[in-house]
Amino acid sequence: IQRSTILAICSLLIFSALCLFGAGVAIASGNSGNQTHVLDYTFRESELEADENLDIDTVKKELEAAGLTSQFSKILQIKVGKPKEHEAVSFEEVIKELKKQKGSKNKEILLHKFKQSTTSHLIPVSEYNELRKAASLPPLELTSKEAYLYMGKDFLPDENLVNSVLKANPQIKVMGNDIKLIGDVQSLQIVTDREITISVALILPDETFMSYTDSKYSNYVSGILAPDLVKEKGLMKAISDTNEKLNQSPLSYESYIQNMGRQLFYIISASYITIYLAIIFLVVANTIIGVQFLM
C-alpha cells in the first residue's frame, strides 16, 4: 500500500512537471509575437500625473529647447476618447457573425470580449493615418457612417478569424447610430508604453470622433528617431544618447528599448520559473522512485 501511494505521488509530480514545462514554453513562445516597430518614444510631462493635457506643440517646444529637434524625424499625436454616453456601443451584429464561424477557443475569447466592449475607445482616422504613414502603410478612408475596428495585439488572439467576420461588413451601434465596419482589423501600437493598452476601439472620421466624445479625450504624443541617426549609431545607442538629453528636460518618456526590456524581463521570469519548477518536480519524482528501487 505504501509503495502504491508513493508511486501515485511520483506520477502526480511527473504530470505536474510536464504541465509546468508546457506552460513555460507556451509563455515564452506566446509572447514573442511580432509587433511592428514604428514609435521610438512616447512623451509625458513630468509635472502631470497623466498626459491628457500634453499636446504636440508643447513637446516640440521642449525638444527644441533641449536641442533634440534634429534627432527626431517625426512627432505625432493620437487622441483616444470614449463615447460621451455610458455603454453606448453595441457589437450585436459582430457577435452574430462570429457565432457563425467554426468553433474554437479563440472564438469564445472574442465573443466574451465583444460582449464586454460596450464602452469602446474611439480614435480619429487622420491621426491614425499619420501612424500608418510612419509605418509605410497606405491611409485609411472613411465616410461618415463607416469605421475600422481596432484591437490591441495583446487582445487579438486570432486576426484571421476577426477579419473573416469583418468581410461581412457588420453594422454596430454607437450612441444609437448605425456604423458599418469595413476593411481589416487594425492593430498598430499607438504608444511605446505597453502599460497603456487598448482592447477594442473604433477608428472614426475626425468630425464623428469629436461629436461622439464631446471633444473630451486623452492625447498621446510620440516620436520617431531620424533614420540616419539610427543607421549611424544603431537603435540602442541612438536611444541611449537621446535619453541623456531628455533627462535634462521637463519631459518624461517611455522609450522602445525600455519597454522591450521590461517585457522581456516579464517573459523570461514567468517562463523560467515554470520550467525551473518542472525540473525540480521531475528531480524529486525520480529521486523518490530511485530510492524505492534501492530499498
Model segments located where?
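Basic-flanked hydrophobic alpha-helices used for secretion and membrane insertion
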Residues: 28, 34-280
